UniProtKB/Swiss-Prot annotation:
It is found in: Cytoplasm. InterPro entries: RTP801-like, RTP801-like_C_sf. It comes from Homo sapiens (Human). It holds the Pfam family RTP801_C. GO terms for biological process: negative regulation of signal transduction. This is DNA damage-inducible transcript 4-like protein.
């Protein structure tokens, strides 16, 4: 039985239409009871596991940014919008949920887009004991603030220049591209804002 919006349960003509088609009240009731057994209850252990996995992924992304700030970005601070890494981690988990090995089969390439140029920051292998089944390319975006470059101009001259290094501000936008390694079809692009 397929439920549609064209039949109204309060309309006597609809009920007689169902009876004329061979549906009897007992079979309708058993059809509804069927869904009670098919739709599973949410498993609390899975929810807790997913939360801890999400938090671990958030820490991996934050560590990547922390390592890259002095080595590859040449700055003393990276300011990340609130919940940005959390949103990215949730999208990564969602994209990995349909994969054969899940998140364990993921290799993530982390980049930063500065003035339309992508700079490679890191490569994260989620589980080195599993052959990768898909790649994710994460592109953080720099916030376009004119005041930061104006401030850097003033502090780059004079006595503050030796000790002061710029602060990089990330935008709340990002791009996440999924590429399946076992299939020619199936590139997925997510633009976060």
């Amino acid at each position: 039985m397929v439920a549609t919006g064209s039949l109204s349960s309060k309309n006597p003509a609809s009920i007689s239409e169902l009876l004329d088609c061979g549906y009897h009240p007992e079979s309708l009731l058993s059809d509804f009871d069927y869904w009670d057994y098919v739709v599973p209850e949410p498993n609390l252990n899975e929810v807790i596991f997913e939360e801890s996995t999400c938090q671990n992924l958030v820490k991996m992304l934050e560590n990547c940014l922390s390592k890259s700030k002095q080595t590859k970005l040449g700055c003393s601070k990276v300011l990340v919008p609130e919940k940005l890494t959390q949103r990215i981690a949730q999208d990564v988990l969602r994209l990995s949920s349909t994969e054969p090995c899940g998140l364990r089969g993921c290799v993530m390439h982390v980049n930063l887009e500065i003035e339309n140029v992508c700079k490679k920051l890191d490569r994260i292998v989620c589980d080195s004991s599993v052959v990768p089944t898909f790649e994710l390319t994460l592109v953080f975006k720099q916030e376009n603030c004119s005041w930061t470059s104006f401030r850097d101009f003033f502090f780059s001259r004079g006595r503050f220049s030796s000790g002061f290094r710029r602060t990089l501000i990330l935008s709340s936008g990002f791009r996440l591209v999924k590429k399946k390694l076992y299939s020619l079809i199936g590139t997925t692009v997510i633009e976060g804002s």
